[in-house]
């Protein structure tokens, strides 16, 4: 499977499929649909059944069951890559038998073991890195390659017992819309796994509760030469508001189960300005407290103003999937056993973000997240270990087999 997996991955990352948050249609970029068409043709050639591509960019397919009495399960990955950094003209570097030293990325950057000590876990293995000018696209082209390679193996070996296996490749996960048009009843799986995690062994079934707060400052513009006592600069209002936000309650000041406020965008002019904050926390009660606290800060700020005002609008994005996974412990237990079967210790950790699986779990499709083998997603220091990708494909196969064993032996 190694060569097929590597060939697929290197072919997929050459296709720029960055999503575009400014575009409200689905998919948000034409390239995602073009990539889905390519994958559809590949799945048909490999012998997958019920291969369907919706006009909204959702590609689904099936591996038919070889035995009866086993639940239908699914595997999910996303077509888009992050818009955070350049995703076009990707030129990967393949480092075989990695020696544990710093890796030069092209001519101008470095993947250093001091900054990224996880590199030392892969001495003697094969790494794929960027050339320092783009992201790599392992999030989530690696997941797509691993799912197709693993399930193609099942098609090639019909003697392996398993129930029906479904796959779905979704658009626009990176901009929070991946589950927006997901047809859960049509998908037909009792549970599923996103193959969208990071380092070897990761298994995630907790994620942030997430909301976005948009704070709009309303000022008063006039000619600066006659501004005395008249002008109210909305940008100054916004800057002063942010200056009093807690300094350590940020992404760079938090870890593990800490939540945060993240100023992700600020823009404006004298008349109007806008601050956009991401609100994140694992604990639903603290999450709600954060939203109330930010609203109260805006109200308090307004109370001290003579002219001008702030307005706040908060929109929930997704919630912690743990609440929906706990009632279905077998979904996690099978994944843990599958990871262990590949000689890996499961690395159970919370997702300091979200996945399609978080929203799908609230749509009656329990959906934990499993590793792809990649590190440092969304930037030029992204890299992935080929051996870890092989292990991910092995975990997918093991999940299919273990599900079959557990239900046939009841």
UniProtKB/Swiss-Prot annotation:
Top-level EC class as recorded in UniProt: hydrolase
Protein origin, superkingdom: Bacteria
Binding-site residues for Zn(2+) 2, renumbered to this chain: 139, 174, 378
Subcellular location: Cytoplasm
Catalytic reactions of this protein: Release of the N-terminal residue from a tripeptide
Active site: 80, 173 (proton acceptor)
Cofactor descriptive note: Binds 2 Zn(2+) ions per subunit.
Name this polypeptide is given: Peptidase T
């Amino acid at each position: 499977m190694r060569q097929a997996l590597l060939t697929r991955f290197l072919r997929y990352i050459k296709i720029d499929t960055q999503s575009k948050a400014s575009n409200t249609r689905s998919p948000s970029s034409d390239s995602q649909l073009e990539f889905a068409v390519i994958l559809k043709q590949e799945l048909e050639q490999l012998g997958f059944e019920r291969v369907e591509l919706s006009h909204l960019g959702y590609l689904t397919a099936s591996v038919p069951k070889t035995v009866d009495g086993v639940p239908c399960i699914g595997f999910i990955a996303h077509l888009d890559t992050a818009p955070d950094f350049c995703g076009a003209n990707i030129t990967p570097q393949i480092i075989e038998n990695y020696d544990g030293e710093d890796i030069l990325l092209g001519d101008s950057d470095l993947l250093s073991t001091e900054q990224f000590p996880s590199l030392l876990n892969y001495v003697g293995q094969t790494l794929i890195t960027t050339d320092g000018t783009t992201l790599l696209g392992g999030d989530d082209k690696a997941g797509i390659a691993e799912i197709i390679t693993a399930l193609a193996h099942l098609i090639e070996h019909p003697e392996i017992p398993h129930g029906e296996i479904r796959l779905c490749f979704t658009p626009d996960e990176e901009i929070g819309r991946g589950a927006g048009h997901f047809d859960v009843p049509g998908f037909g799986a009792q549970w599923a796994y996103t193959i969208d995690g990071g380092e070897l062994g990761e298994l995630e079934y907790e994620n942030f509760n997430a909301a976005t707060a948009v704070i709009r400052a309303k000022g008063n513009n006039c000619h600066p030469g006659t501004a005395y006592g008249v002008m109210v600069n909305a940008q100054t209002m916004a800057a002063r508001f942010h200056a009093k936000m807690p300094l350590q309650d940020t992404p760079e000041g938090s870890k593990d189960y800490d939540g945060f406020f993240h100023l992700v965008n600020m823009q404006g002019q004298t008349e109007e300005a806008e601050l956009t904050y991401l609100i994140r926390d694992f604990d639903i009660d603290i999450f709600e407290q954060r939203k109330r606290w930010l609203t109260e800060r805006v109200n308090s700020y307004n109370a001290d103003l003579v002219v001008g005002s702030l307005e706040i609008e908060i929109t929930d994005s997704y919630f912690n999937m743990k609440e929906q996974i706990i009632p279905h412990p077998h979904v996690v237990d099978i994944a843990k056993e599958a990871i262990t079967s590949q000689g890996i210790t499961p690395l159970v950790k919370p997702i300091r973000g979200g996945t399609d699986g978080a929203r799908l779990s609230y749509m009656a499709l329990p959906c934990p997240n499993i590793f792809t083998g990649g590190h440092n997603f969304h930037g030029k220091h992204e890299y992935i270990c080929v051996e870890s990708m092989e292990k991910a494909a092995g975990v997918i196969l093991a999940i299919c087999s273990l599900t079959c064993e557990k239900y046939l032996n009841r």
